[in-house]
Each structure stands twice: as structure tokens, then as C-alpha cells.
């Protein structure tokens, strides 16, 4: 606003000066012309009056530099830099190490030292009084000979008959009636059946733990000789079961078995099958 008023004042003062200057010049010219014609006192007075007018002192305008107003523009906020997505390298899944198949642990074979169990009790013949004359020999194998067989054994007895007096006779005591002419076929068959049961019982107790756990079965046919004392010697495998451990267990069971002395006429060489089965 101040600049606008100053401009108006400047223009008006210039205009007034121009008017005054023009009027002054015109008066001077008129006065010169009048003087030339004869100066009149009126023109002189007018000129003097004009000259006597006080000149209006016009103050020089202050030149104000009109600098354009500068508005401090707020800097536009820079857009937030969008962070570039960090691409992680795709990790390949680590291959799991292949587990080695575990070998089946071999169970430790515990050697069970078992005392020979007697399935049947041996009754020693007492050589006293009239019983000694009859040569009564008790039958230690249950069910081996019953009924008439026992009567035959008693009737065949004599003072010279063999009696099972040893405690090492084991699981077999045939009806060893004191018959000097030899044992009957029934006695031999009963002795052989009792021998086979004794071997089977011993083999069941000697069943290898590993084969039992793996449910290995088989039949081993053994051949051996019975000594006069009832010990099994020269044990061999005539027919293998297909498993060496079962064969070895059968041989060990036979060698550890001791029975009563065989009856007279019993063949020394015997063949017995041993069956390993899981019940």
C-alpha cells in the first residue's frame, strides 16, 4: 500500500510541476511579447505574483526496492524410500543322513548250568528178607511199563538180578528184571522211549536264546553209543536241522545226559531225533 501511495504522489507532483512550468513559460512569453509591445503593469504583476508563489518542496521519493516477497516454501517431504525386499537365498533342505540299519543285537547266550532233573524217582531195591529173593526192581520211568509189564518184571526177578542202586541213573531206569537170559523187547522199547524223552528234555533246556528269539526251529537226528555205565559217547549229527547252533545245542545236550545202564540185549548204537520247537 505504501508503494502505491508514493507512486500516486510522485505522478501528481510531476503533473503539477509540468503545469506550473508550462504556465510559467507561457507567461514569460506573454510578458516578452507585451514588453515588446509595451510592458503593461498587469502582466508584470502577474508574473511577479507567480514568482512569489511558494514552491512546494516535493520530497524525493524514497526509492524502495521492491523485492518480491519470497515465501519460504516448506520443502516437500521426500517420499519414504521403499526398502527393497531382501531376497534371502533359498536354502536347500539339508539331506538327513541316512540312518544305518541297526543290526539286531545278539542276545548273550547265558549258559545255564542246570542240574539234571529226574522226571521220575528211582526206588532202590532193598535186598532184605524175601524181597531180595524176588529181585524186585522199581520202575523209574512213569508210564513206561504198567499192569502186566510190572508183573512180568517181578516174576522174572531173581537174587542175581540188576538193581538201580546208583543215584546217577538219571531220568531212565528201565525194568531191569534180573533175567540172566536178557531183557524183553518191552523193556528195551521202554528204555529207548525213556532215553528219547530225557534227551528231548535236556535239549529244550539248551535251546539257544538267539534262535529262540528269532523263532528258529528244526529237527536234529543224533547217533551215539551208550556205555555200560549209561553215558552217551561218540555223539554225531546224522541229519542236520539246517542251523548250526541248533545242531551244536543238540550235541551238547546229548553229551551232558547220563542215564541208567542199558538193559541186557539193548543195542549199543542208538539213533534219536531231537526236535527244537517253540510252543
UniProtKB/Swiss-Prot annotation:
Which keywords does the record carry? Cell inner membrane, Cell membrane, Membrane, Protein transport, Repeat, Signal-anchor, Transmembrane, Transmembrane helix, Transport, Virulence
Asked if the Swiss-Prot or TrEMBL record annotates the protein with the keyword Transmembrane, the reply is yes
InterPro entries linked:
TonB (IPR003538), TonB-dependent_transducer (IPR051045), TonB/TolA_C (IPR006260), TonB_C (IPR037682), TonB_pro-rich (IPR049924)
Location in the cell reads: Cell inner membrane
* Segments in the Periplasmic topological domain: 28-279
Ranges of biased composition (kind: Basic and acidic residues): 89-120
What cellular-component terms does GO give this entry? outer membrane-bounded periplasmic space; plasma membrane protein complex
Residue span(s) of domain TonB C-terminal:
192-279
Q: Name one GO molecular function term.
A: energy transducer activity
Could you tell me what this protein is called?
Answer: Protein TonB
Q: Which organism is it from?
A: Haemophilus ducreyi (strain 35000HP / ATCC 700724)
**Per UniProt, what is the name of the gene that codes for the protein in this document?**
tonB
